[in-house]
Structures are given as C-alpha cells and as structure tokens.
Amino acid sequence: MATFAKPENALKRAEELITVGQKQEALQALHDLITSRRYRAWQKTLERIMFKYVELCVDMRRGRFAKDGLIQYRIVCQQVNINSLEEVIKHFMHLATERAELARNQAQALEEALDVEDLEADKRPEDLMLSYVSGEKGKDRSDRELVTPWFKFLWETYRTVLEILRNNSRLEALYAMTAHRAFQFCKQYKRTTEFRRLCEIIRNHLANLNKYRDQRDRPDLSAPESLQLYLDTRFEQLKVATELGLWQEAFRSIEDIYGLMCMVKKTPKASLMVVYYGKLTEIFWMSSNHLYHAYAWLKLFSLQKSFNKNLSQKDLQLIASSVVLAALSVPPYDQSYGASHLELENEKERSLRVANLIGFEVEPKAENRVALSRSSLLSELVSKGVMSCVTQEVKDLYHLLENEFLPLDLALKVQPVLSKISKLGGKLSSVSSVPEVQLSQYVPALEKLATLRLLQQVSQVYQTIQIDNISKMIPFFDFTVIEKISVDAVRRNFLAIKVDHMKGLSSLVNRVLRRKDSGIICLFLAESLSKARTMIYPPAKKAAKLGEALSNLAEIVEKEHKRLLARKSIIEKRKEEQERLLLEMERVEETKRRDVQKMTEEAEQKRIAAEYEQRRNQRILKEIEDRELEEAQALLHEAEKRSKRKKKPVLEGEKMTKKVIMELALNEQLRERQEMEKKLLKFAKSMDHLERAKREEAAPLIESAFKQRLAEEAALHEREQQQEIELSRQRHAGDLEEKRRLARMLENKRILQEKVVSSREAEFTRMKRERQERISQIIQSRKQEREARRKMIFFLRSEEERQKRLQEEEEARKREEAERRKKEEAERQAKLDEIAEKQRRRMLELEEKEKREREEILRKSTAVLPKPAEPPTLGRPAELGGAAPIPAAAATAPTPGPGKYVPKHLRTKMDGAGQAPPPETDKWGGGSKPDDRPSWRDERKPPSFGSGSRTSWPASRR
C-alpha cells in the first residue's frame, strides 16, 4: 500500500502510471488513498481524485472498486459538501452510459460494414466454420463480445448508485433521477428481468426506510417534496411496466403506490389518480377481470368529469360508453359458485383487497367495505348519470341486453348494434393517461353476454329446441363455441341445459319454474302414488288393542332385551373410551411438560450463549477503541515531533478522548500547512526579484547575439540559393537529352496501341453478341415454362371445380335421401302411434265394462248375504273349476249362520225356499259361470286391479 504525504501526489502518480499504460496500478493507488483513514477531511483535491478514479473504473469496468470508492467518499462528503458527491455520481453515470452507447454503435457499425475480399462469395470459409461451431450469428457474437459487458457494467452502475443514495435525505432528487434513468434503460433495451429486480430493489429501499425512520439523514416522507419524488418514481415504474407488458409487476406497482399513500395518510393529486386508474383499467383488462376493469373505468370517468375542465363532449361520451360497455361485459353469473370454503375465503380477501385499491381509501374501515358485483355496478351507473352521457348505440344495446325479452331474435337485433359500436372510438384530445379508446375490444364479451341472455330467455319458453335452430338464432359463434359457453354457465348455476347430439336436440329447464313450483308438483305426485297404493293393497280391519298387544308381547320383550344389551355394551365401550382418553391426556400432558422443560433448558443455554457473545463483542469493541486511541496518540506525538514549537500540548492520559486527539492532530497539521504556505510565499517573492534582475542584465546580450545570428543566416541563405540554381540547370539539360532519345520509339508505340485496341474491340463485340443470344434463349425458355405452368394451374382448377361439383351433388342426393327416409319414418311412427292409441282406448273400454259388471255382482251379493268374517279357504280343485267335497253333517244343517260356508246343494234348497242365491265369487272378486266351471280362457285371464291398472292383451286374445 503506497503512502502519500499529500493527495496531489497520489493524483500525479496515477497520471504517470496511466501515461505508461499501467492503469491497474494507478487505480489501486487511488483506491488506497480514498480508503485510507488519513484523508477523511474533504478538500477540492479529493473531488478531482474521485473524477479520475471513476474514469479508471469505467475504463476498466471495475464496478466493485467504484462502489467501495463512492461509499468512502460519501462518508467524507456527508457533512461537509454533499454536492461534490452528487457531481461525482453524475459523472460516473454519464461515463458508463456513454461507453455503453459507444459499444452499441460500434457493434452496429461492425455488423453493417462491408468487410469481404471477394464480392461474389457469400461468406468466407472461416465465417462458415465459426457459425457452425458456435451456433450463433455475427450480430449475436458482436453483441456478446462488445455490447453485453458494457450493458452489464451500466446495470451494475445503476444498482450501485441506488444503493449509495437510498438513505440520504439530501440526495433524494438524484436518487429519483437515477431510478428514472434505470427505468428508461430497461424500457429502451427490453430488459424485463432487470426491470423486475429494479422494482424489487426500490421496494426494499422503501421498506427499510419505513423500518428505520428514526435514524439520522433519513428521508422524511411526510415532506411534500420527498413524497412527490417517491410518487413520481412509482408512477414511472407503473408506466414502464405496462409498456413492457409486465402486468404482474404493474399490479405490484399499483400496490406500492397505494401502500405509500396509506403510509403517509394522504391522497395524491387528481392528475396522478387519473394515471393510476388508467393503468388499472389496462391491468384488469389483460387479466380478463371485467368486473374490476369496469369499476376502474367508472372511477376514471368520475375523476375526468370532476377535475378535467378541458374535457370535450365527444371525449366524455367515449369514456362513458367505455364504462357502460365494460359493465355489460361482466359475466352475469357468480364466478365463485361451486368453489371450496378455502377458495371462497381467499376470493373474499382478494376482492376486498382489490376494492381498496379501486376505492383508494388511505384509511380503510372494515364496516365500509362492500363486495363488488355486477348488479351494484349497473345500479351505480344509473344513479350517477353515466347512462345519460353515452352514445345512442350503447343505450340501445343496454336496453336490449338488460330490459328486453326477445327469446328468438335477441342476437339478431344485437348484431347490427355491435357492428356500429365496433367502429366507434379514437384518440382523446384531453386525457393524457388514456390517449386512445377503442370500443371494439368489448365486442367479444358482449357477444358472449347476448348468447347467455338468449339461452336464458329460450329456457323460459321452450323445453326442447333443435341445435340447428340455436345456431341460426346466434350468428356470432359456431355451436361448438355456444356449447362451451353453455357448459360454463351450467357450471356456474346460471343455466340448466342438456345437449343430445345424436338426436340433434337441446333440453332446457326453466330454473325459475323449478324453484317455485317444485314443491307443488311433488305434493301432487305423492297424493297420486298414495291413492294407487291404497287401491292395490287395501288396509285390513284393526283388531282389538289388547289382542294386538298380546300377540306382539313376545316380540316387544325380545326387542327390549336386545336394546338393553346394546345399551350395556355401549356403556362399557364409553367407559373404555373414557379411560383411553384419560390415558392419552396424561401422555400428552407428560409430553408437553417434557417439551416445556426442554424449551426452558434451550432458552437458558441460548441466554448464556448470548451473554457470552455480548461480553465478547464488548471486549472486542473496547480493544478496537483502545487501539484507535493509541493510534491517535501516536499520530499526535508524531505531529508534535515534526513541529518546531517549544510549547507542546499536555496529554491527560485516559481523559483525552479519540475525538479530542484527532482534533489536536488536525489542528497541528493545519498549522504546519499554513506555515509551509507562508514560507513558500516568502521564497516565491525572493525568487521573483532575483529572476527580474537576471533578465535585466541578460537583455542587451541577447539583442547583440540576435543581430549577429541574422547576418550569418543571410549569407548562408545566399550561398544555398546559388547552389540550387546550378543544380536546376543541370537537371533540365539531362531531361532534354532523354526526350530526344525516346522520340524515336513514338511511332512504334502508336502502332502497338492501335493493334491492342482493335483486338479488344473485336473481343468485346463477340462477347456482347453471345450475351444477347444467351439472354434471348433464357427469356424464351422462361416464357415456355410460364405457359406450361399456366396451363397446369388451369387444368388443376378445372379438376378441383369438377370434383367439388360432384361432391356437392352427392351431398345433395344424400341429404334428399335422408329427408325422404326421415319423412317415411315419421309417417310410419304416426301410424303405429294411432294403432296403439286405438288399442289403448279399446282396452280401457273393456276394463271399464268389466269393472261395472263386477261392481253390480258385488252389490247384489251384499244385498242377499252378509259378508263372511273370514274368506273361504279354497283348495286346489276349486281353483281349477271342480267342486269341493261336501261333508255329511252339512247336509242336515237347516240354515247356515252368518259367517259360515254354504255348499252348493244347500244353496239350491235355499233357492227353493224363495231366496235367490248370490253368485259365487272367487278370491279375485270375479263372478263364476252358471256351471261353476271356469273355462280355459278364464283361467288364463289375468286379474284386474281396478280402473287404474292397464293390461296389454295380445292381438289373438282380442
């Protein structure tokens, strides 16, 4: 490490090293001087040294050296002359930018220069080999070799300057200027990665500034000038992010602006808020978040209408139309339908966060938060009078989509309105943040909304509809796109649609009818099913309560016993579970106690280690202070030894602090410097008198020597002039002799020249004639090729048209055949339906007739005999038509009692007594034939269960 008595010596030494080409040694010498503790008092020489230092750092691309030097120089200049640091930093950035631009221009010039030896060759062999080996083009190689290192150094320069100026309240303007230049660098050269890092760096600087706001020399954000600088930086960051297409970084910049305003509790000016909401509209549109996009447009409209006095009526109409179209572009269903609870919570938090950004409340209150929705947005548009400012086309579109009920021709009426709206828009003359408004960007979203509205209205009118009819009613999209839109709407619970591609039908469900009338329909269905069950299974008569209780007593006792056993087992299981839980709780408590004990021991060990580390740090700091004090005292003693004064300052031992000793040493150095300047001034004065005396004595001697020198030089000039004239005469005579000698060959030279010229003219004429013949041949051949190609193209087009015509004829024939088959199938199905309907009516008539006959028979039988208590038990022979065996005791029974079985022979006796015997009924309730033997046809006939049953009979049975 070189030691210099004065800073000027170091600068002089560095210049000498630069002259001989040793720039590294010169940089190291200046670096040692700047980082030395001997030169901590600012002086003008240090500024010149820093200028030279940064020039060397830029020339050699030593960013680390530059950062160390600027940090040390900041320490020197912070309290004395901060403007010097500003000048050095500006010079540093200017040099880095200039060298980067120079390298870029050199790369472009190298790429555009014509540096080839053979103009007919495309590339040199070595260029081809290099391109095949490296795999990159010439411009890529030149950029990598020339431009990229300087761009890296320029980026490192910006980072270094921002790091140095981040906590300096006196250089806030320079910090903002550096940030703006870094943004422009990223924008000019499309450096997206560096832009993200730069935004993160600035964001961290603001966080640290807010965290350590009580430190000295920190910027005060409550000051209007500081706040304006920081806001301008954030808005420039927002603009560059949108121009680079970094929408996520642009949204983070919006959050940075909002966080900065919440930090200082102050709302920015209206001009800045216009830029804020203008960029918000772009961000939300690129993220396909139409709801927030519409709210941002509404805020922008309110600001422009309130604060922009130069806003023309046309511009206001365009902005209002954009607000209404953005609101209509919002999907009419809930996007979060069907999401999980965690997703709903996250969406709620995100919506509240975005609502704060759009509302821009620097002190948001929880009770004032309102969730954003499409319905509230549309009502707000009407209440704020936005609809009165829009164009007539937008009003018509709003009326069609929100108020009209046109289930068949809604899309057809919307289409011409959208075509007119797509042509509206243009540049705005008085809105700087939104220079241009194009309403055509909302047309796709509005077409989707018109499709949803049409499907919603059609579902309220029709249950099924043909897919072809839907495609005709919606001219915007193909049916595949319509199907995707419908699937999304069904998933969001907006529509209920089923599509059958085999039948070409679409089933629609009216969600309003299903919600309101579903309970009534279910009630009617339940009553009908209950009646049908009662007719099929009629309820039996209830027995006595005591008999029922006695008959079910054993079952009840068994059930009660099982229930008690189950309850006992449940109680036992609960006891075991309780014991297990108690054991588990004891084990958990023991584990917790051990963990707490372990944490206590670890905390004690950490406390002991921290105390030991603190004592060690204090000891190291004390040793450092003692060493610095000793160095200061040694410096003071050395200064006293150099001093010639007899009276020396008395050291007070431990009472003398380092600051006092440094002040004494600096005062001593200042006194020595002043004495040295006085001595130099006295010596210069004496040297001035001596020099003047010497010049007065030497003046006459110099004059006489000058006159003598003039005479000598005049004689010498005359002599040299005569010699030159003689030499010129000799050269002229020799030239004349040479001319006479060469004049004899002049005729031969002329003959040779004519011969060469004639031969070359003949050769040129021959080559010109051959070239004309070759060109005519080429023209003829190309003409023939074009003719052949034209004929081939005509033939191919004719063939394609013929094939296409044949294909269309074949498709038409197939289509006619399909329509004919469909028509025949429909006619055949109609005939079959008619035949089935006639059969059903005939069966209903037969069943109704049988029912009437059966009721008539039952009515007659109940009028003659009382109904038996128990149904008769019929054996297998009776079921097959044979007579049951008659017991002997029954023959002598005079009159059957009520509830007894009456055989056939007794019924004849009763008939003789004057009573009409009732017809015998089987277990199905049907009457038998006179001979009590049902035929084979009656045995095969299934029973009828009343009018509600429907029986299908074969055609042969009917």
UniProtKB/Swiss-Prot annotation:
<feature type="region of interest" description="Disordered">
    <location>
        <begin position="804"/>
        <end position="958"/>
    </location>
</feature>
<feature type="domain" description="PCI">
    <location>
        <begin position="316"/>
        <end position="513"/>
    </location>
</feature>
<dbReference type="GO" id="GO:0003743">
    <property type="term" value="F:translation initiation factor activity"/>
</dbReference>
<keyword id="KW-0648">Protein biosynthesis</keyword>
<feature type="coiled-coil region">
    <location>
        <begin position="93"/>
        <end position="123"/>
    </location>
</feature>
<dbReference type="GO" id="GO:0003729">
    <property type="term" value="F:mRNA binding"/>
</dbReference>
<dbReference type="GO" id="GO:0071540">
    <property type="term" value="C:eukaryotic translation initiation factor 3 complex, eIF3e"/>
</dbReference>
<comment type="function">
    <text>RNA-binding component of the eukaryotic translation initiation factor 3 (eIF-3) complex, which is involved in protein synthesis of a specialized repertoire of mRNAs and, together with other initiation factors, stimulates binding of mRNA and methionyl-tRNAi to the 40S ribosome. The eIF-3 complex specifically targets and initiates translation of a subset of mRNAs involved in cell proliferation.</text>
</comment>
<feature type="compositionally biased region" description="Basic and acidic residues">
    <location>
        <begin position="804"/>
        <end position="859"/>
    </location>
</feature>
<comment type="subunit">
    <text>Component of the eukaryotic translation initiation factor 3 (eIF-3) complex.</text>
</comment>
<protein>
    <recommendedName>
        <fullName>Eukaryotic translation initiation factor 3 subunit A</fullName>
    </recommendedName>
</protein>
<comment type="similarity">
    <text>Belongs to the eIF-3 subunit A family.</text>
</comment>
<keyword id="KW-0396">Initiation factor</keyword>
<dbReference type="Pfam" id="PF22591">
    <property type="entry name" value="eIF3a_PCI_TPR-like"/>
</dbReference>
<keyword id="KW-0694">RNA-binding</keyword>
<keyword id="KW-0175">Coiled coil</keyword>
<dbReference type="Pfam" id="PF01399">
    <property type="entry name" value="PCI"/>
</dbReference>
<dbReference type="GO" id="GO:0033290">
    <property type="term" value="C:eukaryotic 48S preinitiation complex"/>
</dbReference>
<feature type="compositionally biased region" description="Basic and acidic residues">
    <location>
        <begin position="929"/>
        <end position="942"/>
    </location>
</feature>
<dbReference type="GO" id="GO:0071541">
    <property type="term" value="C:eukaryotic translation initiation factor 3 complex, eIF3m"/>
</dbReference>
<dbReference type="GO" id="GO:0016282">
    <property type="term" value="C:eukaryotic 43S preinitiation complex"/>
</dbReference>
<dbReference type="InterPro" id="IPR027512">
    <property type="entry name" value="EIF3A"/>
</dbReference>
<feature type="coiled-coil region">
    <location>
        <begin position="796"/>
        <end position="861"/>
    </location>
</feature>
<dbReference type="InterPro" id="IPR054711">
    <property type="entry name" value="eIF3a_PCI_TPR-like"/>
</dbReference>
<dbReference type="GO" id="GO:0002188">
    <property type="term" value="P:translation reinitiation"/>
</dbReference>
<feature type="coiled-coil region">
    <location>
        <begin position="548"/>
        <end position="696"/>
    </location>
</feature>
<feature type="compositionally biased region" description="Polar residues">
    <location>
        <begin position="946"/>
        <end position="958"/>
    </location>
</feature>
<dbReference type="GO" id="GO:0001732">
    <property type="term" value="P:formation of cytoplasmic translation initiation complex"/>
</dbReference>
<keyword id="KW-0963">Cytoplasm</keyword>
<dbReference type="GO" id="GO:0043614">
    <property type="term" value="C:multi-eIF complex"/>
</dbReference>
<feature type="compositionally biased region" description="Low complexity">
    <location>
        <begin position="877"/>
        <end position="894"/>
    </location>
</feature>
<dbReference type="InterPro" id="IPR000717">
    <property type="entry name" value="PCI_dom"/>
</dbReference>
